[in-house]
Amino acid sequence: MSPDIGPWVARFERPGREIYDRRHEIVAATGVEAGMVVADIGAGTGLFTRLFAARVGASGTVYAVDISPAFVENIRRTSRAEGQHNVQGIVNSPSEVSLPPRSIDIAFVCDTYHHFEYPAAMMRSIRAALKPGASVVVVDFRKIPGFSTPWVMGHVRADESAVVREIEAVGFRLVEDRDFLRRNYFLRFVPVEDSNAH
């Protein structure tokens, strides 16, 4: 692990962070299966990349997509060290995920959507990368006055209903809203033409 990644691992992969504590339930809820192609968008330290890589197996692929070259290089290095040869790293731009067209079964966006500088462009880019019948899972912080922490209230740009409106405005439909997390929501979207597929 490169020295600049260590503090991020300590921050993101720690007991007490809901996403870390419930990571196995979150992965199960995505429906990722052996042989699938998954994009972990905003992959960060690779927590979910590693879990998806184990789940899709040798016949599947996980794209670890992040805007940070240091994060992507760390994921490449740690994946190789752990024998996960089904992981590919992609450094993306603020408005483009840089994935091959019609290549993925599930796009997973965890505690990352609120960082998108150009959410409409990013979601259109993700849509272009989806295979027919594919879906996008968005997990992000609940932003609720009186419930959410001051950090979330100040840091997270949009609440859940605004996120749903933004994503639906670029040609997606919400098809699943799972209520098993306390501090985060779990939403699944499909392109409008595929809205009856799930």
Model feature map: region roles:
Residues 176-198:
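Core SAM-dependent methyltransferase catalytic element
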Residues 135-164:
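Conserved class I S-adenosyl-L-methionine
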Residues 54, 120-135:
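A short glycine-rich, Lys/Arg-flanked "PGG" loop and its adjoining helix->strand segment in the class I
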Residues 105-120:
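A short SAM/SAH-binding and catalytic strip from SAM-dependent methyltransferases
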Residues 37, 61, 133-135:
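Short glycine-centered segments of the SAM/dcSAM-binding site in methyltransferase folds
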Residues 1-39, 77:
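Class I SAM-dependent transferase core
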Residues 97-106:
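A short acidic, Gly/Pro-enriched loop at the edge of an enzyme's catalytic core
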Residues 39-97:
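Class I SAM-dependent methyltransferase SAM/SAH-binding core
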